[in-house]
Amino acid sequence: LKALPLHHELWYEIDDIQDLDIAESIFAEDTITPIASRYGGYWRYPHILDYCYLVNPYFPNSRLLAEIKANFERLISQYPSGVRVNSLLAGKNFNIKPEYVVVGNGAAELIKSIMENMEGKIGITLPTFEEYPNRRDKTTVVSFIPSNPDFSYTAQDLKTHFADKDISALLLINPDNPSGNFIGFNEVLDLCEWTQKKGIRFILDESFVDFTDESVHNTLLRNDILEKYNHLIILKSISKSYGVPGLRLGILATSDPLVIGRTKQDIAIWNINSFAEFYMQIYGKYETDYQKACLRFIEERDYLKKQLEAIPWLRVIPS
């Protein structure tokens, strides 16, 4: 066994194929591409600071994590519940009827189901969260690109652009990802009304709505709205603002029984693991803490915005 003295050289011990895979990404000339192409698992790189995934650093708190840790052995050794129970838990947490909601293995699983089963063409604002257009044939995507440097747009802009387009569905991510554009409650409701009259399915992604000021007043995730607008499908990731991307949780909500039934057929009976289910089971005890965490996040965002605006050579895009 030989040993070599090292001073400032970068090194990595390789004992198996996994070590080799990690080393190849560390020592590559272009380190960003091989690491980014992993789409996660960045605990393997303890010195990396990940600014790509928009996750709330203030939630879950230590008490919630302690409760999960205390139940670790029981959770890892038992099967989770099936689809019906998970819909019940999600309905309780979001105060909507269980029959209106499907829980997915992250919002990505639900996006895949909706996008691949949607007939006709779909209107999408660009730039966007790529999981949506990536699940469609490019010929079925009708795009709208805002003609301003901030990538900002209103509900009226969407209505004007798509009024004469042959689309069967319209996607709105609100707040948008990655632009941060936000459309207020009344405007979104007006867009929902417009799509209903036009016979267009309205897909609304509210994954980031809890990061908005007065977020409780900005969501359409309500029984009365879902029941009035049968064409409305709401998607929400339980990763971003909830700070638990590793649990892989997301919900789809609609009063359309055909969409609910088709989505449930697409997912596996045990698509959610025991830890994710337990999180939904105990979340209600920590809801006040979650709301405080979101307020703290908003304060930090406002502070960051002011600090960036003080730099003369930066143009800060409203978000």
Positions of PLM-derived features:
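N-terminal "arm"/small-domain region of PLP-dependent enzymes with the aminotransferase-like
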Residues: 22-78, 165-166
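PLP-dependent aminotransferase-like
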Residues: 109, 116-172
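PLP-dependent aminotransferase class I/II
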Residues: 231-316
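Short loop-beta-helix segment that forms the pyridoxal 5′-phosphate
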Residues: 80, 91-113
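Catalytic donor-sugar/metal-binding loop of nucleotide-sugar-dependent glycosyltransferases
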Residues: 1-6
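Hydrophobic beta-strand scaffold residues
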Residues: 141-142, 202, 316
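Short, conserved phosphate/pyrophosphate- and ester-handling motifs at nucleotide-, phospho-/glycolipid
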Residues: 16
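Active-site pre-lysine segment of PLP-dependent enzymes
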Residues: 152-165, 178-241
